[in-house]
C-alpha cells in the first residue's frame, strides 16, 4: 500500500478515505504535457518524491480497461521515457526497447 506517499498532495488523503472528490484533489491538468500539483503544505523534498513510481501519471483508459493486470502486461504497461517494456518474465527479467515516440 503506497497511497500514503501521495498525501502531500492537497486533499489526497481525504480522497483516499472517501471524504473528497477527484475534482477536489490538488491536481490540475493544464494540457497533454503539463500537470499542476498543489500541496497540503510546503514540501521541499517533493521533487525527490516524484522519482517514486507512485507518482507516475497514468492513462485512465488503460487502467480502467484492466484494473488488476495493466501494470504487468507489456502491451498495456504505460511508460513515458526513452524505453518501452516489450517482455516481462515475472521474477526473472524485464526487456525494454527504444521508444520511438
Annotate the PLM regions:
Residues 1-5, 36:
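Aromatic- and charge-enriched surface segment that lines or borders ligand/interaction sites
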Residues 12-24, 30-33, 39-101:
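Gly/Pro-rich hinge or "lid" segments in bacterial periplasmic/extracellular proteins
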Amino acid at each position: 500500500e503506497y497511497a500514503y506517499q501521495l498525501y502531500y498532495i492537497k486533499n489526497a488523503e481525504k480522497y483516499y478515505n472517501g471524504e473528497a472528490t477527484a475534482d477536489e484533489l490538488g491536481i490540475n491538468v493544464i494540457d497533454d504535457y503539463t500537470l499542476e500539483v498543489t500541496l497540503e503544505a510546503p514540501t521541499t523534498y517533493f521533487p525527490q518524491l516524484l522519482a517514486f513510481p507512485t507518482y507516475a501519471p497514468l492513462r485512465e483508459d488503460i487502467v480502467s480497461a484492466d484494473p488488476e493486470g495493466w501494470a504487468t502486461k507489456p502491451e498495456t504497461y504505460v511508460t513515458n521515457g526513452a524505453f518501452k517494456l516489450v517482455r516481462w518474465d515475472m521474477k526473472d527479467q524485464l526487456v525494454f526497447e527504444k521508444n520511438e515516440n
